[in-house]
Swiss-Prot record:
This is Transketolase. Belongs to the transketolase family. Its cofactor is Mg(2+); Ca(2+); Mn(2+); Co(2+). Mg(2+) binds at residues 156, 186, 188. It is an enzyme of class 2 (transferase). The lineage of its organism: Bacteria, Bacillati, Bacillota, Bacilli, Bacillales. SUPFAM superfamilies: Thiamin diphosphate-binding fold (THDP-binding), TK C-terminal domain-like. The gene is tkt. One of its GO terms (cellular component) is cytosol. Keywords: Calcium, DNA recombination, Magnesium, Metal-binding, Thiamine pyrophosphate, Transferase.
């Protein structure tokens, strides 16, 4: 089945990776040199993926979780016709399509951004979850309209990361059949021999999760690799294939050592290695025509045939199930149904509710009118109000179910949501307590880097949590999330702001959203619908203003907005001119014009107070050197919530006191 041309192709891929790294004088040659045979076998014999048709919905997904081995992926993309050779020559250089670690939306053929070890593995679980759910929802007899695999190339480091344990446990529990992990098991980590830090029995570990385990003893045996992948595709449940490789294979002096993990070979070792491969070291970035032909006649031919057959099946599916087909096409587009927002609840002045509860009510309507809406909670659905009441649970028996039980696996949940968003066909969300956002912070960051439409629900947003005490009362989390570029961090002040916050979350196609919601009830602000709609979308707006000459600005978010209004009304009775500004989304506000910002925060009004039950970090930008911030510079306390709030100075009386001190 395999012949000398296959070996030439593998060694060419190795050589391209080496040359790219040598030219950049930066990179990780060890993994591409060791893992090239398994990647080649997967791409030429199994992968249903055409880089030139990168948006084909039913393609297989390939995730290089070991993102430091990016030169391998770029070499594969080149020989399969997606990436120009010149881009390999610009590896890790400014403006190139070959950055140090693979970047989603930056390079065609890269499914997700990887590099932070373990996250690619966990995002792959999310992709397999998306495939399973969409297949359960749309597939019919003779119409497997969603039917593809998620393949992962993972390293020792990926499997050491804690997130891999969370994600593997979840995948095994849910028996995600279409998930296949190729584990590059080379017994070397960056610092040295793996046995200095890692001695797990991979077989026992993954079988305990409910995975299938296959061992490939020789990572250069193409038939053994091919047979293992074929076997994995025939089994129920996820499969990990441990492929024993030699890091830096072919390097006479560095193979099998950590010296080849993260540094160029050097010119002398490069020449020796090329001779080991039977290649001419004088030729750089050389790709024989036979190598291109192999990929054209195998991978690309197969992918084109599969895509053509799928398009014909979709046409027949559309005739047999027209309504379902329209829903599927809308899901593939990533768009929302027209006028979906008209179905969302509006709240009058008689309403008082926790923003988490209002969000829960909104979620019921979103699930009804946005079929692609899908997600769950990290074992806090009852508290987060995040489950869809009329929907089934997602599991292996009811994959069409809409409520995902992520369990107490916050980090894996966050990464899985990102995987689902990158997969397409869904508007995914995840939920937990705000204080536990720290557990999934790296996934939040990666969602922003990738520009994903991921939504994260964070409830119990302040010291008003009360009795649970400082471990469960967020302080620094708001400032931390606001510091992430390209992240909507929305802390709504009432049910109507919460409604618009959800609209922003779903409509922000390339910006993830964190919804920061209260446990305690909030009265409805006396503001008309259009003002709220426009104001929340712009990040800050006026919710109350006296008729007197403007003298004071009170800025707040969330539950503190109503407190600011109460203080402003007292000041109004004293004849003071005061404006209250709700600032639910700093990120959106910073994108507004200078004219809009000036209309909200007039520069000639310097007596300003910001009120927020969190770290004051960041507010000084808005209050200026003459202003004050009523915030919290310590951790919370355990007591009834109302008492804790009072003790920390979040009272009308303290606001008035601070105003008088200006």
């Amino acid at each position: 089945m395999f012949n000398e041309k296959d070996q030439l192709a593998i060694d060419t891929i190795r050589a391209l990776s080496i040359d790219a790294i040598e030219k950049a004088n930066s990179g990780h040659p060890g993994l591409p040199m060791g893992a090239a045979p398994m990647a080649y076998t997967l791409w030429t014999r199994h992968l249903n993926f055409n880089p030139q048709s990168k948006d084909f919905f039913n393609r297989d997904r390939f995730i290089l979780s070991a993102g430091h081995g990016s030169a391998l992926l770029y070499s594969l993309l080149h020989v399969s016709g997606s990436l120009e050779l010149e881009e390999l020559k610009q590896f890790r250089q400014w403006g190139s399509k070959t950055p140090g670690h693979p970047e989603y939306r930056h390079t065609d053929g890269v499914e997700v951004t990887t590099g932070p070890l373990g996250q690619g593995f966990a995002m792959s679980v999310g992709m397999a979850l998306a495939e399973s759910h969409l297949a359960g929802k749309f597939n019919k007899d003779q119409f497997d309209i969603v039917n593809h695999y998620t393949y992962v190339l993972a390293s020792d480091g990926d499997l050491m990361e804690g997130i891999s344990h969370e994600a593997a446990s979840f995948a095994g529990h849910n028996q995600l059949d279409k998930l296949i992990v190729l584990y590059d098991s080379n017994d070397i980590s960056l610092d040295g021999d793996l046995d200095k830090s890692f001695s797990e029995d991979t077989k026992q570990r993954f079988e305990a999760y409910g995975w299938n385990y296959i061992l490939v003893e020789n990572g250069n045996d193409l038939d053994e690799i091919d047979n293992a992948i074929t076997q994995a595709k025939s089994q129920q449940g996820p499969t990990i294939i441990e492929v024993k490789t030699i890091i830096g294979f072919g390097s006479p002096n560095k193979a099998g050592s950590n010296g080849v993990h993260g540094a160029p070979l050097g010119e002398e070792e490069r020449a020796l290695t090329f001779k080991e491969y039977g290649l001419d070291p004088e030729k750089r970035f050389n790709v024989p025509e036979d190598v291109y032909e192999i990929f054209k006649s195998t991978m690309l031919k197969r992918a084109n045939e599969n895509e053509e057959a799928w398009n014909n099946m979709l046409k027949n599916y559309s005739e047999a199930y027209p309504e379902l087909a329209e829903e599927f096409k809308l899901a593939m587009s990533g768009k929302l149904p027209n006028n979906y927002a008209d179905a969302l609840p509006e709240y009058d002045l008689n309403h008082s509710g926790a923003s988490r509860a209002d969000s829960g009510e909104i979620i019921q309507k979103l699930s009804e009118f946005v079929p692609s809406f899908f997600g769950g909670s990290a074992d806090l659905a009852g508290s987060n109000k995040s489950n869809v009441k009329e929907a089934k649970d997602y599991n292996k028996d009811t994959p069409e179910g809409k409520n995902v039980w992520f369990g107490v696996r916050e980090f894996a949940m966050g990464a899985a949501i990102n995987g689902m968003a990158a997969h397409g066909g869904l508007h995914p969300y995840a939920a937990t307590f705000f204080v536990f956002s720290d557990y999934l912070k790296p996934a939040l960051r990666l969602s922003s880097i990738m520009g994903l439409n991921s939504t994260f629900i964070f409830t119990h947003d302040s010291i008003a949590v009360g009795e649970d005490g400082p471990t469960h009362e967020p302080i620094e989390q708001l400032a931390g999330l606001r510091a992430i570029p390209n992240m909507n961090v929305i802390r709504p002040a009432d049910g109507n702001e919460t409604r618009v916050a959800w609209e922003v979350a779903l409509e922000s196609e390339q910006t993830p959203t964190s919804l920061v919601l209260t446990r305690q009830n909030l009265p409805t602000l006396d503001v008309d619908k259009q003002t709220v709609e426009n104001g929340v979308r712009k990040g800050a707006y006026i919710v109350f203003e006296t008729e007197q000459q403007l003298e004071y600005l009170l800025l707040a978010s969330g539950s503190e907005v109503n407190l600011a209004v109460e203080a402003a009304k007292e000041l109004e009775q004293q004849g003071k001119g005061v404006r209250v500004i709700s600032m639910p989304n700093w990120y959106a506000f910073e994108q507004q014009s200078s004219e809009y910002k000036e209309s909200i925060l007039p520069s000639d009004v310097t007596k300003r107070i910001a009120i927020e039950m969190a770290s004051p970090l960041g507010w000084h930008k808005y209050v200026g050197i003459e202003g004050k911030v009523i915030g919290i510079n310590s951790f919370g306390a355990s007591a009834p919530g109302d008492l804790v709030v009072e003790k920390y100075g979040f009272t009308k009386e303290n606001i008035l006191k601070q105003v008088r001190s200006l």
